[in-house]
């Protein structure tokens, strides 16, 4: 580790791992859930999405009170979205309300309604939640532009 440079690709991975450990592995009881999450991350990097889903599903079923569960639901929603399992993606995205990932869940919900369901009105309602309730979100400006684009298209 002493020879690790800032430009080394492993540096970002180590910083991300440090943040995960600090945030989600504060108690010894969190060890198992953290282990399943890290295993799922490895599967995601290997593009073994089915295996990642199994690990994450087990995590959320077995450790519902674990601090990392909301992040697991986000990963589940994103994987299901990528696999075009929109019903499952929506189910997990809706579980992100009142978590630190609520804005991402709302945006994903809006995307599902817009892209899959072709329900522009409901997707706009979701996007407007970001504009009204999540002004601090890094996604605020891109969502604002997207809403404007949709409204121009619908006019």
Predicted regions and their residues:
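Acidic, polar-rich low-complexity tracts and alpha-helical solenoid repeat scaffolds
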Residues: 1-155
């Amino acid at each position: 580790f002493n020879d690790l440079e800032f430009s080394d690709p492993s540096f970002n991975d180590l910083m991300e791992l440090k943040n995960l450990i600090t945030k989600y592995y504060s108690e010894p009881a969190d060890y198992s859930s953290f282990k399943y999450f890290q295993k799922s991350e490895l599967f995601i990097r290997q593009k073994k999405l089915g295996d990642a889903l199994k690990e994450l599903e087990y995590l959320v079923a077995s450790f519902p009170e674990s601090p990392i569960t909301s992040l697991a639901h986000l990963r589940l929603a994103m994987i299901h979205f990528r696999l075009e399992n929109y019903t499952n993606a929506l189910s997990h995205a809706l579980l992100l309300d009142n978590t630190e990932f609520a804005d991402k869940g709302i945006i994903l919900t809006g995307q599902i309604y817009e892209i899959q369901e072709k329900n522009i009105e409901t997707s706009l309602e979701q996007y407007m939640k970001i504009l009204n309730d999540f002004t601090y979100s890094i996604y605020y400006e891109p969502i604002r532009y997207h809403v404007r684009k949709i409204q121009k298209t619908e006019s």
